Amino acid sequence: MEKKATIYTATGDNGTTSLVGGTRVSKNHPRVEAYGTLDELNAHLGLLAASIDDARIVAFIEEVENNVMTIGCELACEGNKMPTVSKEKITSLEREIDKLEASLPPMHEFILPGGGEAAARANLCRTVCRRAERVMVTVNGICQVPQESMVYINRLSDYLFLLQRFLYNGKEKKWEKPCK
């Protein structure tokens, strides 16, 4: 009789998990923290996409989700078993950044988060993305993270910041006490 597949294995009940390749590590290992944070980012990106009516932006966010998933898988793998995001994916992201930046007025002051549900979700995605980048820097001190992945996540936080501004639709709220 064939055993039915199940979501639980009980192998992680002691606070460890397996990297792709079989090595057991603590669930608070920096690699696990990094790919877990990218998983969290993807969940927020899904919510962001669900709150946007612009099909072109939604399609691009879905492309981003695939790239974030690739980077997460790469961090979960031992050695160089998974492909990384390509330089073309970075170039695509930079093109979207350039388009958004060209459509927005220059910014001279800090702005507050918010500006409607979609803008607030973009800002939340940006902050989770920056946290993921910080954890990836930690991982890079333990084992090499491909440079393309580091660059992609760094650019993604820029994209999400500009997307937040774009979704604000010109109604940005300035910080009342700007740094001087």
Sequence positions of predicted segments:
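Phosphate/pyrophosphate-binding loop motifs in nucleotide- or prenyl diphosphate-using proteins
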Residues: 1-180
